[in-house]
């Protein structure tokens, strides 16, 4: 076949996008005795496919915190990804395990299976007395439809129990009293808990466009994702949630600097007899994953105690100027200057008032 430089470059990028590959170099070597033939050699430098992290911390609110995670992107040399995460503190316990096979079929169909358990006594370290316990699992398939695009479909099952007390916020007490299967639990000494238990079956669908030149530490290309989840009829609570993210990497000044632009939008609404999104489905703003410089999960609506409660609409955007590092560290770490903007809203609380604060009413002629 004729040598196509564009196809060779594309093969190089495909290899670079593997999470366990650090660098790829291409060499065209002439075949001895045949001046019209060349051998295309790919020199691949691998990165460590396994990542392990763990820590012990202490805070005034959470007390002793234990956390650990194991991620292996080339498990037993199969190319499969296995991830285990453990987090345990005074107010939250999170455990999850997932397995992803990127080539479940010869056509490149991906399958991901995951299970999770969480027990969260408080939404944030400053939240009121409110407990969420849930366990569930997800099966998700991804279907490539072009070089850069993938469609995904799956099903999630979640069993949840939410518990509040007379010391909880008004929002928490209202939600458990009006959704799912409410119950009252008397634990003695005059203490009464109000709770609800419910099962949800969520259909999930997504679209991904990814033209980045690397899966880790990309410096050019675009990544877009849109995900939609819908709690189907038959679930004890019904809702939908949609999320869109856009990330663009723009190389600058001889490819030594990179401008990264990221935006994220999210919205969710309760459906049917459900009065509001389940509290654990609310969006939160602030912290390293959304609006840096603000306390984690501290932006947006407040509960009746003036503490973060989350909202059903998320708007956030980040701009990073990624600074050049020595070649030794360029593929292992990044430093950047950033500017973030965003917030979380609750559309159920939107009202229109005049300049004196009086509510406005509009009556058509």
Where are these regions (language model features)?
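Gram-negative/organellar outer-membrane beta-barrel architecture
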Residues: 2-218, 222-223, 289-308, 312
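C-terminal transmembrane beta-barrel domains of outer membrane proteins
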Residues: 18, 64, 69-71, 81-101, ...
């Amino acid at each position: 076949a004729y040598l196509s430089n564009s196809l060779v470059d594309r093969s190089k990028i495909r290899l670079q996008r593997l999470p366990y590959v650090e660098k790829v170099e291409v060499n065209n070597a002439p075949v001895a005795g045949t001046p019209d033939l060349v051998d295309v050699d790919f020199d691949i430098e691998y990165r460590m496919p396994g990542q392990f992290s763990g820590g012990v911390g202490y805070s005034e609110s959470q007390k002793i915190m234990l956390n650990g995670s194991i991620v292996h992107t080339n498990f037993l040399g199969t190319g499969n990804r296995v991830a285990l995460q453990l987090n345990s503190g005074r107010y939250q316990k999170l455990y999850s395990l997932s397995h992803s096979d990127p080539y479940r079929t010869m056509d490149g169909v991906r399958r991901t299976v995951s299970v999770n358990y969480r027990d969260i006594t408080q939404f944030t370290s400053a939240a009121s007395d409110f407990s969420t316990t849930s366990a569930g699992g997800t099966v998700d398939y991804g279907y490539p439809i072009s070089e850069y695009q993938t469609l995904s479909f799956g099903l999630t099952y979640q069993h949840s129990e939410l518990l509040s007390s007379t010391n909880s916020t008004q929002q928490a007490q209202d939600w458990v009293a009006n959704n799912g299967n409410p119950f009252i639990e008397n634990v003695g000494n005059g203490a009464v808990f109000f709770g609800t238990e419910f099962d949800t079956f969520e259909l999930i669908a997504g679209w991904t466009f990814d033209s980045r030149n690397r899966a880790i530490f990309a410096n050019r290309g675009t990544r877009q994702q849109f995900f939609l989840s819908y709690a189907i009829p038959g679930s004890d609570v019904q809702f939908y949630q949609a999320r869109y993210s856009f990330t663009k990497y723009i190389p600058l000044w001889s490819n030594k600097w990179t401008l990264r632009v990221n935006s994220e939008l999210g919205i969710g609404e309760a459906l049917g007899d459900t009065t509001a999104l389940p509290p654990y489905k609310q969006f939160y703003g602030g912290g390293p994953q959304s609006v840096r410089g603000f306390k984690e999960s501290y932006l947006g609506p407040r509960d009746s105690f003036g503490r973060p409660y989350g909202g059903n609409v998320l708007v956030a955007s980040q701009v990073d100027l990624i600074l050049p590092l020595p070649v030794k560290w360029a593929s292992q770490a990044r430093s950047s200057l950033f500017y973030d903007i965003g917030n979380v809203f609750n559309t159920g609380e939107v009202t229109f008032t005049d300049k004196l604060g009086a509510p406005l009413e509009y009556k058509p002629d």
